[in-house]
Amino acid sequence: MPAIALVAAGARLGLSLGKTFGARGFEVALIARSRERLDDLTGKLGAAGVTAAGFPADVADRPALAAALDSAAGRFGRIDVLHYSAPAAGSGETARGTGTLEVTVDNLQPQMESICYGAVTATRAVLPAMLAAGTGTLLYTTGASSVTPVPVFASAGMAGAALRRWILALNKALADKGIYAGHVAIGTWIAGTPGAPEGVSPKEPDDIARLYWDLHASRERAEHLISA
């Protein structure tokens, strides 16, 4: 069976992606920092009839992330689809990054590690096997500030923009090698995420997940922006 690796898998979009691809015959490798989260996600996917296994790793710990993906490939044979959900560093308001006039090398570096360098590390871990097989899919998620500047999210937006440019270059560089690379920028609230602003209509994670399947199956576009 084919396998998808969900890096930085979460309880909303990550779970929906696992169900969406699992319903179409994929086994699911889940990578996240928390063993408790991994156990919860694998249990929910198992209840939905999806074969899943968790591999703990922090995306900012490059050796651990690469090792987790190697373990996932060993467990499932190989990784056919990679999804990297670029997490901003920090928690709460700090996870959104630093405002434009407050950006420094020191506060930009953690965003680059988590959003950009983690994605490169994950890609390098699975790409050789994809190249050898002549097929594969690389999917990446960032916030909309990677496409449209948002001054209050400057540092996260800078890291996301760097990742976005590389993804678009990957799409071109891999097109004749049987491998598809696609980018999704999410500029809306996902249903179930705490703290949604008043008046915002969140999008259901299952609906968003189906978009990723369509990108994987059709390979027709390199990028999709989900707006409010």
Regions found by a protein language model. Give the residues of each.
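Canonical Rossmann dinucleotide-binding motif of NAD(H)/NADP(H)-dependent dehydrogenases/reductases
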Residues: M1-A29
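Rossmann-fold cofactor-recognition segment
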Residues: L45-P63
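Conserved glycine-rich Rossmann-like NAD(P)H-binding loop of the short-chain dehydrogenase/reductase
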Residues: F26-D40
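Conserved mid-core segment of classical short-chain dehydrogenase/reductases
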Residues: P87-D106
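Catalytic loop of short-chain dehydrogenase/reductase
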Residues: A88, V105-N107, Q111, I115, ...
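Hydrophobic positions on the long internal alpha-helix
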Residues: A68, H83, Q111, G118, ...
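Rossmann-fold scaffold of SDR-type NAD(P)-dependent oxidoreductases
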Residues: V7, I79-E93, I115, Y140, ...
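C-terminal helical subdomain
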Residues: L168, D176-A228
